[in-house]
Amino acid sequence: MTEVGPSSESTDAAKPASRRRLRRWLRWSAVLALVLPVGVGALFGARLDRDPSLVSSPLIGQPAAERTVPYLEQDGAMSLSDLRGQVVVVNFWASWCVACREEHPALNAAAAAYRDAGVEFIGVVYQDRPSSAIAFLDEMGRSENYRYVTDPESRLAIDFGVFGVPETFFLDETGTIAAKITGASTLPLLSGVLDEMLAGRTPTPSTNTGPVQEAPDE
């Protein structure tokens, strides 16, 4: 029996179709080669390089905790609820924190500048020995318009969602958290938020100036 194979005519007819499929595949491969890196880059860029100042803290717009905390250098204690009716700046700091040392002059300057405006500044010692915190203030200086308090067992820090320092929160006259700075504060940043709040406007809710520092292991 004679085996019948494909005719030369049918083979020739299949060649253009095969070439069309090959060209189509190459064209789509070229498109994907261009699109995929852009898409992946955009995805990772959105996740890794997005501006954290545009991401609001979930605490913004929420009432601040009313926990009572003891003063660092004097007898007695205070609660943030004692300061209702005033704009309040709450700064979490520690003597072992490098960025806290960097921002300290700016906080002191802001406390002095906004004293007549009735702004209260609270410095909350975070996971630090009182003696070390006092030594820090002896070296770096204190502001008269500042209340320095301790935070036993970090309960106030937990209420504010603090896991490292420095972090600074701004409370409006109703005791609501209006804004937050993560990382070292600067005088322009502090003034920008306070000027907006004192004028009755909504400040930038969340600004990130750098990483925070966790407490060292003892």
Place the predicted regions along the sequence by residue.
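Structural microenvironment flanking redox-active thiols in thiol-disulfide oxidoreductases
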Residues: 101-141, 151-159, 209-218
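C-type cytochrome heme c attachment motif
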Residues: 95-102, 167
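Thiol/disulfide oxidoreductase modules built on the thioredoxin-like
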Residues: 138-144, 150-201, 205-218
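Aromatic-flanked redox-active Cys/Sec active sites in thiol-based oxidoreductases
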Residues: 91-97, 126
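Active-site acidic short loop of glycosyltransferases
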Residues: 84-85, 116, 143, 162
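A short beta-strand-turn-helix
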Residues: 67-88
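Hydrophobic beta-strand anchors of alpha/beta hydrolase catalytic cores
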Residues: 89-90, 121
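N-terminal targeting signals for export/organelle localization
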Residues: 1-66, 210-218
